[in-house]
């Protein structure tokens, strides 16, 4: 049975797409049992949590993965480093006004070269950096924060596009639900919390191009989950608490783990696509930002609470002039 992408469309006023992080954010709380909606300041999240609950967050750290490069003609090309393979080799996505003919040698801002070659993927290319240093150090010198295209920023590095608990470098996008937390809020949480690591890939920005969303293929991302987290969640279930995932990356990590033949710690790749009809295994609640129309992230929310209720929540958020997407306000589903 087909699932029409237009079921996940809604009218989002452009002015509600936040361009910068607010000092104080709002929280829309949706209670699944009674279908009740409230809007509070984000710091009041602690009143909706109990000691038996647990929060699972993503401690990935955004790397400055956007690079400027130039063709021999002088035409500009943007490189987005998806994965660092070795000191001189990476998997990248390219963006330019005209299709890049491969293989291609591009000139970097440092004056050094990078060779771009095709792979079996239509999106991801192989890049060989002919540089004196390693790629990670090169990104620190010349890379920029890979902000989504709808956020206009002149800053090369945006310090606000990083969670307060970011630890392990590798993401090209922040797990933005975590941006609402401060160390002060973490210290006042009434329940335990822990961290998975999923390095958010460029696939998070890719649109669904099929009318039938079931034909969409998610981009692979690697995650790491520990025995400590698995034990925490099992204990939470035993104590009738709720496992609340902070962000869609944490949702996908936990649901993918609980779909394995054995629930064990380790590093895995996942291309799990959560949409209506998905059978949830472990996540009881979600903290997430407000997402764009027709996005896989909004489809995940529709799966969690039903498409009709998701649209109702979003309409109320729009009427309340809550901010959307990366720097926007948050939604707590419990």
Question: Model-derived features: where do they sit?
Answer:
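A cross-family signal for N-terminal binding/gating loops and helix N-caps
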Residues: 1-334
């Amino acid at each position: 049975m087909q699932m029409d992408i237009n079921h996940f469309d809604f009218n989002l006023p452009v002015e509600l797409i936040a361009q910068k992080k607010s000092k104080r954010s709002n929280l829309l709380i949706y209670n699944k049992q009674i279908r009740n909606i409230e809007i509070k300041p984000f710091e009041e999240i602690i009143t909706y949590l109990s000691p038996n609950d647990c929060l699972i967050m993503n401690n990935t750290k955004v790397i400055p993965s956007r690079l400027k490069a130039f063709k021999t003609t002088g035409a500009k090309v943007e490189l987005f480093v998806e994965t660092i393979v070795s000191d001189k080799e990476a998997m990248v996505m390219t963006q330019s006004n005209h299709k890049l003919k491969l293989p291609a040698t591009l000139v970097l801002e440092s004056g050094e070269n990078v060779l771009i070659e095709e792979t079996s993927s239509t999106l991801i290319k192989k890049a060989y950096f002919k540089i004196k240093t390693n790629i990670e150090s090169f990104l620190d010198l010349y890379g920029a924060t890979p902000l989504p295209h709808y956020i206009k920023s002149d800053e090369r590095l945006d310090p606000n596009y990083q969670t307060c608990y970011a630890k392990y470098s590798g993401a090209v996008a922040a797990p933005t639900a975590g941006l609402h937390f401060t160390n002060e809020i973490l210290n006042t949480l009434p329940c335990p919390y822990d961290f998975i690591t999923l390095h958010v890939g460029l696939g998070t920005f890719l649109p669904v191009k099929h009318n039938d969303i079931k034909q969409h293929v998610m981009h692979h991302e690697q995650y790491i989950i520990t025995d400590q987290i698995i034990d925490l969640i099992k204990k939470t279930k035993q104590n009738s608490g709720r496992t609340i995932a902070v962000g869609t990356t944490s949702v996908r990590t936990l649901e993918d783990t609980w779909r394995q033949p054995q629930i064990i710690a380790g590093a895995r790749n996942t291309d799990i696509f959560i949409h209506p009809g998905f059978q949830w295994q472990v996540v009881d609640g979600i903290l997430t930002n407000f997402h764009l129309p027709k996005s896989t992230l909004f489809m995940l929310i529709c799966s969690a609470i039903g498409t009709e209720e998701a649209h109702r929540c979003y309409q109320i958020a729009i009427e309340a002039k809550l901010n959307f997407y990366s720097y926007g306000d948050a939604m707590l589903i419990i």
